[in-house]
């Protein structure tokens, strides 16, 4: 059976390596390892049943429930009080006692899912092209059998087959229609893992979907690059990615140092591979894939024509005529020029420069990388430079950081986790309930995790490598990851300051003041000139540089734009800090908050909604916007924005009492009602209304929402896993594993706490 290993435990077994380094004892790291001797016959039979059940219902319920982790944690034998289920009949009203009973059931169960290091592990997945990238990187470097056991491969294949759509194709993500992106990459992955087309109906259907939709020549840009790397698509069929762009003067808006960090880091290694025109080993399997992905013989394909071809299922953001001119010029004139003397010397210099940056990124993220995409790319680049180098070998044990196992199989996470981000919210959720005394042990462990996950140092020579300040910040995941995130820093700061108000006898010693000052200094450094906050760094360039985005799949990826959610989280952290430490950088903080509030108000749409970029979508945006405005001193009476926001939310409440927003809201930028209540959407809307003072105006919508949440609560005390609510670039949807529990707990806790307070 498989076992989940946490923190220092994860340094052994499959993750064991003298090349595996950490800065804080692997805090937050979660690795699945296979133990052939583990488990009783009954436990193994239960795992098999859960897997069969998922496969049987996979087209009706695409989201896994993370049941294998829950099985393991249940076996640990945590003692739980015998709390009976809360049942509210249709003709009954919710009472304070009902809410409190529901809360206790939820928190008692949820506390048992906390890891010993203080965070809550879970399945942070949902994007279907990430595992193929990791498999491709292991294939071309010859390490597939070194890193992955037969059990790994079996579970990865299970996952890919489970998430094949009924039409035979695969989507870009678990949610949504089949695309050439998802289909080509997952088909090739199955082949590389040893699956054969002969007598394999699933592979045959996948191939049929690909061929009937234009073949792999109609794949989008990112897919074409990866297919080129493994040798089943020719590099001449790609839009040029010029390595020399990194050599232009830094002050120019088009220098990649000014791009959003994800695009900068991903295209950095893509540019290296393009400049090298690197192709992995041409094995018999690769030759088979060449035959199976196209309607005509591989040798007869017109690669230049294929360059601009993209299937309609993948063509989300067509190139403009200006972009067409740019890429034609780069492909026809610029790239060929750098392949002949004397300009090829500049290409060699450019490639060496890129490798210098790639090595720096790897070393300063403990070989985790910013994300699994640039990690997989960097790993290949390091192997090309020297297959025997530590720089390459250190990548291998960190692959496990991205693998997660559930009843639907083994999948790749979208990051190395969201440990810090979710733990900060969980702390705030538990504190909102007023039940701190009962769950002080849970809070104490979470407190320790957050305190010990702070980034303590700036990166050496960071400016030369385009990196922002990091000292005092928190990352999305672990300190080892190393990439500072403004909103994660803001929310964690807020959680820590809330805990500092509680007796140390209950939750442990407070964080040091110096650490708080470092956090505030770092937060203020993230502020744009207009007081707004972007996702990772300050906005560094103008929106017109989006003409350099060659991707048909993703929009607005060149610039790190400011966002309502990021801005709200950042200023809430600053506001919480000034309440306790009013004398530290007060003038700067006040100015920042003033400008940030203006930004949030100005981003409100005519119908009273706020667009949420990092979650689904308008309920998510409203929660952060209203919460941020309230923290800054606005209220329902003095803020038209808050009144309009509340009116918008109330207009979307379903007759049953909850809210249900479909993920397509993010794509079309209009609220799309899913028709059924979603626990997370309901909780976010409920919290926004609570913060605005809805309980004093008319508590009826809140009682209806609370009744809906309680009716959704499972027998275990948890809330159901429903449609994914994480979003990236308005086009990729994935799962935040703890949202399903933390937000309902927060909403019910805040409601109960305010009901009690209103009667005192």
Swiss-Prot record:
Q: Give a yes or no for keyword S-adenosyl-L-methionine in this entry.
A: no
Can you supply a Gene Ontology BP term from the record?
triterpenoid biosynthetic process
The subcellular location is: Membrane
What's the protein's topology in the membrane? Single-pass membrane protein
Q: Which InterPro entries match?
A: SQ_cyclase_C, SQ_cyclase_N, Squalene_cyclase, Terpene_synthase_CS, Terpenoid_cyclase/PrenylTrfase
CDD domains for the chain:
SQCY_1
Which segments carry the PFTB repeats? 153-194, 642-688
Q: EC number(s) for this protein?
A: 5.4.99.48
Primary localisation category: membrane
UniProt KW keywords: Isomerase, Membrane, Repeat, Transmembrane, Transmembrane helix
Origin, by domain of life?
Eukaryota
Reaction(s) catalysed by this chain, per the record, are: (S)-2,3-epoxysqualene = achilleol B
One GO MF annotation is: intramolecular transferase activity
In this protein, the active site sits at 487
Q: What class of enzyme is it?
A: isomerase
Ranges that cross the membrane: 612-632
Q: Can you list the GO cellular component terms from the UniProt entry?
A: lipid droplet; membrane
Family the entry assigns = Belongs to the terpene cyclase/mutase family.
Q: What does this protein do?
A: Specifically mediates the conversion of oxidosqualene ((3S)-2,3-epoxy-2,3-dihydrosqualene) to achilleol B. Achilleol B is probably formed by cleavage of the 8-14 and 9-10 bonds of (3S)-2,3-epoxy-2,3-dihydrosqualene as part of the cyclization reaction, after formation of the oleanane skeleton.
Q: What name does this protein carry?
A: Achilleol B synthase
Organism lineage reads as: Eukaryota, Viridiplantae, Streptophyta, Embryophyta, Tracheophyta
């Amino acid at each position: 059976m498989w076992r989940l290993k946490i923190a220092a435990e994860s340094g052994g077994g499959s993750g064991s390596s003298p090349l595996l380094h950490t800065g804080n004892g692997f805090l937050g790291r979660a690795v699945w390892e296979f133990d052939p001797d583990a488990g009783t016959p009954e436990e193994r039979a239960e795992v098999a049943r859960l897997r069969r059940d998922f496969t049987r219902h996979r087209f009706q319920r695409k989201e896994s429930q993370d049941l294998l982790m829950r099985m393991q944690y249940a076996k640990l034998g945590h003692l739980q009080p015998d709390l009976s289920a809360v049942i509210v009949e249709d003709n009954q009203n919710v009472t304070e006692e009902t809410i409190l009973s529901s809360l206790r059931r939820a928190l008692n169960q949820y506390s048992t899912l906390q890891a010993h290091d203080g965070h809550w592990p879970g399945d942070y997945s949902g994007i279907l092209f990430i595992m193929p990238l990791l498999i491709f990187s292991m294939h071309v470097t010859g390490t597939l059998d070194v890193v992955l056991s037969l059990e790994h491969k079996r579970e990865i294949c299970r996952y890919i087959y489970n998430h094949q759509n009924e039409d035979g194709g695969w989507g870009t993500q678990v949610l949504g229609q089949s695309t050439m992106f998802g289909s080509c990459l997952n088909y090739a992955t199955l082949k590389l893992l040893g699956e054969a087309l002969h007598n394999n109906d699933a592979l045959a259907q996948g191939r049929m979907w690909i061929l009937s939709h234009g073949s792999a020549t109609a794949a989008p840009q990112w897919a074409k690059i990866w297919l080129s790397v493994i040798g089943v698509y020719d590099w001449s069929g790609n839009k040029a990615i010029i390595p020399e762009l990194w050599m232009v003067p830094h002050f120019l808006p088009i220098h990649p140092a000014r791009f959003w960090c994800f695009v900068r880091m991903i295209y950095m290694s893509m540019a290296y591979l393009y400049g090298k025109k690197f192709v992995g080993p041409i094995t018999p399997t690769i030759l088979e894939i060449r035959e199976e992905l196209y309607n005509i013989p591989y040798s007869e394909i017109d690669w230049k024509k294929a360059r601009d071809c993209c299937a309609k299922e993948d063509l989300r953001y067509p190139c403009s005529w200006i972009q067409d001119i740019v890429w034609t010029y780069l492909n026809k004139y610029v790239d060929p020029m750098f392949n002949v003397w004397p300009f090829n010397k500049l290409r060699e210099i450019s490639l060496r420069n890129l490798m210098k940056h790639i090595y720096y990124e790897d070393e300063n993220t403990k070989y985790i990388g910013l994300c699994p995409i640039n990690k997989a790319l960097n790993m290949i680049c390091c192997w090309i430079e020297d297959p025997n180098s530590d720089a390459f070998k250190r990548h291998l044990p960190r692959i496990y950081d991205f693998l997660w196992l559930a009843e639907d199989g083994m999948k790749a996470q979208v990051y190395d986790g969201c440990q810090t981000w979710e733990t900060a919210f969980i702390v705030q959720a538990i504190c909102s309930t007023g039940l701190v005394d009962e769950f002080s042990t849970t809070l104490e462990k979470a407190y320790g995790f957050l305190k010990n996950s702070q980034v303590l140092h700036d990166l050496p020579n960071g400016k030369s490598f385009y990196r922002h300040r990091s000292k005092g910040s928190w990352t999305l995941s672990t300190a080892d990851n190393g990439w500072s995130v403004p909103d994660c820093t803001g929310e964690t700061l807020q959680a820590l300051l809330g805990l500092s108000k509680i007796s140390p006898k209950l939750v442990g010693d407070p964080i040091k003041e110096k650490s708080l000052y470092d956090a505030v200094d770092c937060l203020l450094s993230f502020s744009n000139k207009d007081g707004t906050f972007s996702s990772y760094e300050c906005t560094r360039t103008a929106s017109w540089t989006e003409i350099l985005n060659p991707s048909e799949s993703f929009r607005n990826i060149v610039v790190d734009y400011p966002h309502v959610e990021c801005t709200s989280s950042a200023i809430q952290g600053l506001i919480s800090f000034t309440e306790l430490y009013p004398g530290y950088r007060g003038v700067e903080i006040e100015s920042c908050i003033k400008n940030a509030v203006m930004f949030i108000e100005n981003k409100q749409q005519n119908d009273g909604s706020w667009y949420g970029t990092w979650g689904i979508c308008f309920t998510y945006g409203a929660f952060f916007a209203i919460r941020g405005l309230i923290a800054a001193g606005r209220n329902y009476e003095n803020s038209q924005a808050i009144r309009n926001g509340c009116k918008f939310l109330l207009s979307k409440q379903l007759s049953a009492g909850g809210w249900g927003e479909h993920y397509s809201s993010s794509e079309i930028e209009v609220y799309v009602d899913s028709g059924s209540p979603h626990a997370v959407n309901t909780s976010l809307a409920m919290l926004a209304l609570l913060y605005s003072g809805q309980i004093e105006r008319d508590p009826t919508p809140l009682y209806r929402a609370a009744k809906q949440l309680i009716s959704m609560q499972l027998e275990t005390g948890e809330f159901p896993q429903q449609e994914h609510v994480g979003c990236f670039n308005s086009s990729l949807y994935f799962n935040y594993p703890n949202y399903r529990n933390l937000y309902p707990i927060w909403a019910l806790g805040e409601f109960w706490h305010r009901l009690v307070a209103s009667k005192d």
